């Protein structure tokens, strides 16, 4: 299964058919980060059944005193599942169809990406790039789980700029020829999912050729004429940016201890991920809103006005068609607009203010929530929210190519329940 491409086939592990899918799969660890009740309910749903919930550390628990013990339990579960639970394997890709709440079907290919073809360093131009700024302080807690882990299970979703639908969609057109691996409902409103094994050599070659064409200099120059001659971009990280960065950091750490020959084949060099086509109608790019906690809405508004007056032309009430957003608190909600803003995107200007505000209010805490009803619920509990305008997905790749990265947590793909659920696993320890 050797390939020179940055995304290739893998030895993918799955649980035995006796394990219920609705208990095995759980949502990405970086969802519901302010909602412990969600994760407590997930724990109740799983009970004593094997589940990927036991292989991850939900971020809601990252700062708890027992986080280290949780990591130990995760590693122990990985060893147990390697022996007794993950009894099926695919040598290739898994073609996935996820039916979203809207009824649209999101198609994807699960395979491994080469971490040598990826970097989150500022200014780097590898074939695989983050879509948003990577906050290095967020990497170590994720490294603690991956370091020493026997297995990985992915919630990383990669995006291909494939307007001709050459990579993922042709596999879906022939799914009747493939062996179905799983199908069923996902827990807690996750919807329906099905997966098929892609192991046929001709199909593997087809995927490799399509990917090579997408990542060619000729295709890159045609798609982005303003960046003609620059290093081509093949895949961008859609979801799971910091988890992928942690995998890269762990690989660099391990690589330093390996011989050149060992570096060529060690399983930790790769990371399992799902690749989707950004042009799919089922891919929705939604803004991620900001919510401040332990603050007073009136104080935030006064500070915002003062900061805007000092750093730009000010702020006005109503939509001025420049950078409009909604500031919402427990009892108030106002549309505001930055005048002569300091950043190209509304999210960038809002982030600059939040950074300024939090530097002066040590009690303040910020969370990033992409579901507007969830944001409104948090404001009723005392949070102060910055609700951001829609983000056009057509600008995503152009923004990465021309600007390097977008501001941190600019966008999200779908609602929280529609995020990738952990199902497939891969061994990363020799």
Which residue ranges define each predicted feature?
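Short beta-strand segments
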Residues: 159, 237-238, 274, 387-389
